[in-house]
Amino acid sequence: MLKYIIPTIMLMPLTWMSKGNMIWINSTTHSLLISFTSLLLMNQFGDNSLNFSLMFFSDSLSTPLLILTMWLLPLMLMASQHHLSKENLTRKKLFITMLILLQLFLIMTFTAMELIFFYILFEATLVPTLIIITRWGNQTERLNAGLYFLFYTLAGSLPLLVALIYIQNMVGSLNFLMLQYWVQPMHNSWSNIFMWLACMMAFMVKMPLYGLHLWLPKAHVEAPIAGSMVLAAILLKLGGYGMLRITLILNPMTDFMAYPFIMLSLWGMIMTSSICLRQTDLKSLIGYSSVSHMALVIVAILIQTPWSYMGATALMIAHGLTSSMLFCLANSNYERIHSRTMILARGLQTLLPLMATWWLLASLTNLALPPTINLIGELFVMMSTFSWSNITIILMGMNMVIPALYSLYMLIMTQRGKYTYHINNISPSFTRENALMSLHILPLLLLSLNPKIILGPLY
């Protein structure tokens, strides 16, 4: 485990000691090396658990998320270069340090063995993200967005702390591996209902559940590109990961407590997908689409069958790469046209033909085109919800159609048609951007050849 944590910590002195012209090259190459070493974790069997120490362990649920976390840092650094080109050197170094700190916290969160340790790190990821949003965001609205982000997440996760202390007093341990053997079945009582809510709400706000999702589009729209990427790709997956881990100790309460939340999520994914159809703001559209994809994951986790768990883990990884790529594309438009409104950025295919290819690929993966892992995840979730209740096929079918509509709408609005006249001096697409997009799309295509490595512990 230390072979990921120590190089990540050493990235910070590397950044601060680099000269101005070498800072991006050094940090990006070093973080790419870390992400390549993390691929060694891939050859892990489904039922295997690597116990690194008393603090850290990884199994086949946390491994794909861990690799995704490490894969995203070099991509975030590549994407942020233009955004920070006007800043002075100290600010650049501070920004990179924030990203590295965030990655460090996330690596430790996904491998934490104690629930309290997991909780502390889960909250610690809030601080660098908040600094990134409120310091390097684009508009003055970013302070408001940061407040929303902070208070939704904090108010959601404080009851979890109380619940964890209660479990510690009852059981005597919060170790993931011990809890499997020690935990008692929860009986149906008011105190246990509140306990269930306290444990689940923290992660449902983070996912976010429809109704508690208001912070997400705000935070996405105001965050700089690296903030948006890490928020969509990894911080939302923290919620799903936490839910998958904590449902272990909440049985058999989840069987009947899950009904309102499953209904809310099924309804919410249709609603947020429909909201996407009438968005004018590009980043807001991608933000709402990630709410609707995460609603599927909530449904899958609450149904609690092996198939739905596999679908949830596959969908989390697929959505992480897809939404991150879409945010990069939206940002490359924003850097050229200085506007996120889709009406002002029409007909870019004639100006940037290679970018149009990336837009097409990203839109197709977002609408779950076969044979991508997005489709594999969605099909697993769809089949498990259908076997849970037949009537959900209507909602699920709508949820297959509406993302196709808004993805194609986004593609046609930005790429097709006649370009607007205020686009006069537009820079061509850089090699950096093309490399960034290909590093997003290649893992998606390669994983669709062998999806079993991301199907989680039950495969």
UniProtKB/Swiss-Prot annotation:
One of its GO terms (molecular function) is NADH dehydrogenase (ubiquinone) activity. Keywords: Electron transport, Membrane, Mitochondrion, Mitochondrion inner membrane, NAD, Respiratory chain, Translocase, Transmembrane, Transmembrane helix, Transport, Ubiquinone. It comes from Bos mutus grunniens. It catalyses: a ubiquinone + NADH + 5 H(+)(in) = a ubiquinol + NAD(+) + 4 H(+)(out). Core subunit of the mitochondrial membrane respiratory chain NADH dehydrogenase (Complex I) which catalyzes electron transfer from NADH through the respiratory chain, using ubiquinone as an electron acceptor. Essential for the catalytic activity and assembly of complex I. This is NADH-ubiquinone oxidoreductase chain 4. Its EC number is 7.1.1.2. It is a multi-pass membrane protein. Its main location: mitochondrion. Coiled coil: none annotated. GO terms for cellular component: mitochondrial inner membrane. Belongs to the complex I subunit 4 family. The chain crosses the membrane at residues 20-42, 60-80, 98-118, 147-167, 193-213, 224-244, 256-276, 285-307, 312-334, 351-371, 393-413, 435-455. GO terms for biological process: electron transport coupled proton transport; mitochondrial electron transport, NADH to ubiquinone; mitochondrial respiratory chain complex I assembly.
